[in-house]
C-alpha cells in the first residue's frame, strides 16, 4: 500500500547518453567504456539520484537495461520496466538503445504502446508504421492519486534518414555537395515526418487509454524537438474548431496535456500575486526556461514532462500542482572533467508536484 504521508512527487526525464556496460561497444567497435570510465559514469548517475531524489524517472539511450535496473535499485528504485532490447549488429556492437522507467512506487502494469496502423495508413504513412523507439507505458500506483499512466518516449532524432554513399561513387567534389544537399533536405524532412507522426499517433493512444481507464497521464522524455515549432505542438492541443462549445472545454481539459514548465509559471504567478517578497524574488530568478541541449552556438529545450489536468492547479478537480522545475545542466555549462567526463549531453529535467491543500 502506498503511503499517503507523501505530499510531494518528483518526476525526472534523464537521457543517459550511451549507457552500455563494457566490454560491449556502441555503434562502433572502438566505442567501449574502460572499467574506470564505466565506474565514473555509474557514479555520476547515482550522485544525481542521491542529491535530487526523483520518485519516477524516464530514461533514454539505455543499451544495458538490466545493468541500469541493478544500479537504480541501490538508490531505492525497486520498480523498473522496459519493453524492448537494443539491436546487436555484431557480437558486441550495439545500436538502437531503448527507453526505461524507474519508480519508488509500485509499477502495476507495463505495456509497449503500438501505433494504430489503420490510422497511420489514413495519414499516408507506411502500412507497418512503428515508433523509432518503442514507447513504455507504465501504470504506477502513486500516492493520493492512485494508478497513473506514465509514458516514456525518445522521439525520432533530426538526423537525416538518407545517407550519401561517397565511397562507392566516383563523384566530383561538386557532385558530392549536390547529393549531400539533396539527402539532407529529403532525409531531414523524412525524420521530421517520422517524429511528428510518432507524437500524433502516441497522443491518439493516450486519449483512448484515458477514455478507457480515466487514469491521470504523464508523458516523459527526449522529444528531439522543441514543442513550439509546429512539429510536436499537437501534443498540447487545447482548442477545437467547429465544435459546439457546450461542455467542450471540460472535455478538452480531461484529454489534453500541459507542459510542466507552463504549469510551473502559473504557480509562480499565483504565488507572486499573494505579495510575498520571497516568492517575487523566486519569480525573477526563474524567469527563463533553461535549455536541455547545446549544439555549437545554439541551444534548445528537447526534454519535457507533460501532464494531464490532475496536475494543473487551475483545474477545479486537480490534486497536485507543479511547485518546482529544475534543469540540471552544470555538466553542460560548467563541466569539470574529473566529475563530468562520463555524464550526458542533455540536461536533466526534474519537476516537483505538491499536493494541493
Regions found by a protein language model. Give the residues of each.
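Short, solvent-exposed loop/turn elements at domain surfaces
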Residues: 19-24, 159-161, 314-315
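Structured beta-strand-rich core segments of catalytic domains in phosphoester-bond hydrolases
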Residues: 62-160
Amino acid at each position: 500500500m502506498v503511503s499517503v504521508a507523501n505530499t510531494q512527487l518528483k518526476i525526472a526525464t534523464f537521457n543517459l547518453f550511451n549507457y552500455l556496460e563494457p566490454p560491449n561497444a556502441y555503434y562502433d567497435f572502438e566505442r567501449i567504456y574502460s572499467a574506470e570510465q564505466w565506474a565514473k559514469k555509474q557514479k555520476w548517475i547515482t550522485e544525481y539520484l542521491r542529491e535530487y531524489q526523483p520518485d519516477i524517472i524516464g530514461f533514454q539511450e539505455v543499451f544495458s537495461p538490466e545493468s541500469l535496473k541493478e544500479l537504480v535499485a541501490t538508490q531505492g528504485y525497486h520498480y523498473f520496466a522496459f519493453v524492448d532490447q537494443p539491436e546487436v549488429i555484431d557480437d558486441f556492437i550495439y545500436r538502437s538503445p531503448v527507453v526505461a522507467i524507474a519508480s519508488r512506487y509500485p509499477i502495476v502494469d507495463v505495456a509497449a504502446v503500438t501505433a494504430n496502423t489503420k490510422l497511420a495508413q489514413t495519414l499516408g504513412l507506411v502500412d507497418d508504421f512503428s515508433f523509432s523507439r518503442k514507447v513504455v507505458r507504465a501504470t504506477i500506483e502513486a500516492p493520493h492519486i492512485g494508478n497513473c499512466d506514465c509514458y516514456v518516449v525518445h522521439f525520432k532524432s533530426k538526423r537525416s534518414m538518407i545517407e550519401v554513399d561517397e565511397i562507392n561513387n566516383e563523384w566530383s567534389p561538386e557532385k558530392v555537395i549536390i547529393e549531400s544537399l539533396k539527402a539532407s533536405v529529403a532525409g531531414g524532412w523524412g525524420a521530421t515526418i517520422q517524429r511528428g507522426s510518432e507524437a500524433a499517433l502516441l497522443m491518439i493512444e493516450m486519449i483512448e487509454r484515458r477514455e478507457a481507464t480515466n487514469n491521470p497521464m504523464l508523458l516523459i522524455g527526449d522529444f528531439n524537438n522543441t514543442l513550439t515549432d509546429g512539429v510536436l505542438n499537437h501534443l498540447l492541443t487545447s482548442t477545437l474548431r467547429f465544435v459546439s462549445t457546450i461542455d467542450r472545454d471540460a472535455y478538452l481539459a480531461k484529454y489534453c496535456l500541459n507542459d510542466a514548465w507552463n504549469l510551473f509559471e502559473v504557480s509562480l504567478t499565483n504565488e507572486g500575486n499573494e505579495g510575498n517578497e520571497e516568492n517575487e524574488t523566486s519569480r525573477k530568478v526563474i524567469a527563463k526556461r533553461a535549455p536541455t541541449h547545446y549544439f555549437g552556438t545554439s541551444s534548445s529545450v528537447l526534454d519535457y514532462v507533460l501532464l494531464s489536468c490532475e496536475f494543473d492547479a487551475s483545474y477545479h478537480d486537480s490534486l497536485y500542482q507543479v511547485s518546482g522545475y529544475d534543469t540540471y545542466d552544470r555538466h553542460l555549462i560548467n563541466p569539470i572533467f574529473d566529475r563530468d567526463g562520463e555524464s550526458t549531453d542533455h540536461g536533466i529535467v526534474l519537476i516537483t508536484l505538491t499536493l494541493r491543500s
